[in-house]
């Protein structure tokens, strides 16, 4: 098990730009020791025959094919515009 000292906690806090009150240093020291103890347990697991992965769950591409469908004619769409100029929508100038 990795032993964490209060100076280690102060150093990590400094690197993270955290201001820790002195009365909380001991609490964080104990918590970090528990976390690293858990990591040590994970290191003991045999992963020799486990294939590497990038995700916990297999991701399947569920997208459909992008098919072009004509629902309205160009003329129908242009006729719905409040302002039209030839084959274009006329919109207010924005500047």
Curated annotation (Swiss-Prot):
A Pfam family the protein falls into: GatC
Family of the protein in this entry: Belongs to the GatC family.
EC numbers on record: 6.3.5.-
Origin species: Prochlorococcus marinus (strain NATL1A)
Taxonomic lineage from the root: Bacteria, Bacillati, Cyanobacteriota, Cyanophyceae, Synechococcales
The protein's name in its UniProt record: Aspartyl/glutamyl-tRNA(Asn/Gln) amidotransferase subunit C
Catalytic activities: L-glutamyl-tRNA(Gln) + L-glutamine + ATP + H2O = L-glutaminyl-tRNA(Gln) + L-glutamate + ADP + phosphate + H(+); L-aspartyl-tRNA(Asn) + L-glutamine + ATP + H2O = L-asparaginyl-tRNA(Asn) + L-glutamate + ADP + phosphate + 2 H(+)
Function comment: Allows the formation of correctly charged Asn-tRNA(Asn) or Gln-tRNA(Gln) through the transamidation of misacylated Asp-tRNA(Asn) or Glu-tRNA(Gln) in organisms which lack either or both of asparaginyl-tRNA or glutaminyl-tRNA synthetases. The reaction takes place in the presence of glutamine and ATP through an activated phospho-Asp-tRNA(Asn) or phospho-Glu-tRNA(Gln).
Gene designation per UniProt: gatC
Entry's Gene Ontology BP terms: glutaminyl-tRNAGln biosynthesis via transamidation; regulation of translational fidelity; translation
Alphabetic keyword roster: ATP-binding, Ligase, Nucleotide-binding, Protein biosynthesis
GO molecular function, one term: asparaginyl-tRNA synthase (glutamine-hydrolyzing) activity
Entry-linked InterPro entries: Asp/Glu-ADT_sf_sub_c (IPR036113), GatC (IPR003837)
Subunit structure: Heterotrimer of A, B and C subunits.
């Amino acid at each position: 098990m990795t032993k964490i000292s209060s100076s280690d906690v102060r150093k990590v806090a400094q690197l993270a730009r955290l201001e820790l009150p002195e009365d909380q240093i001991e609490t964080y020291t104990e918590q970090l020791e528990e976390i690293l103890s858990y990591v040590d347990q994970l290191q003991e697991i045999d992963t020799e025959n486990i294939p590497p992965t990038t995700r916990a769950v297999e991701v399947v591409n569920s997208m459909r094919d992008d098919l072009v469908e004509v629902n309205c004619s160009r003329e129908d769409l242009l006729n719905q515009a409040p302002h039209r100029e030839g084959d274009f929508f006329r919109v207010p100038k924005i500047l």
